Amino acid sequence: MKYRLALTAYRLKVAVLVSSYDHCLADLLYRQHSGELSCEIPLIISNHTNVHRLPEFYGVAFHPTTDAKDKGDAEQRIVALLGQHEIDLVILARYMQILSSEFVQQFPWRIINIHHSFLPAFVGAKSYQQAFERGVKLIGATSHYVYRCAR
């Protein structure tokens, strides 16, 4: 068993990775700004440029990876940014990219994914469509630690 103790006065530094849908990001930033979420969010990284307005509004550093040569280059940039900002925890807020095993292994038990459906019932990017096709009347979200790559 592994555990880690931390002072409660210490506020975790959290980076948020997001793709083009920014409603999850908006909620996290609002809750942090209002004091409901006790952490710092000094960094937002996206594989799209259209989400830049929220970080600008909240005064948070925004770094798009849209000019990366490939997935490996994008992940290297992300790792560098996480190190520069001394990030403790990474939140994937509708980040629609599959992270490599190498990336995940660099941040053991420090990545939380917010998935836009009830797992394990609806896996993947089209979970709303899957729920609709099954006649589901109530949808929600699931969050979980990312500790290994399924593929």
Predicted regions and their residues:
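One-carbon transfer enzymes
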Residues: 1-151
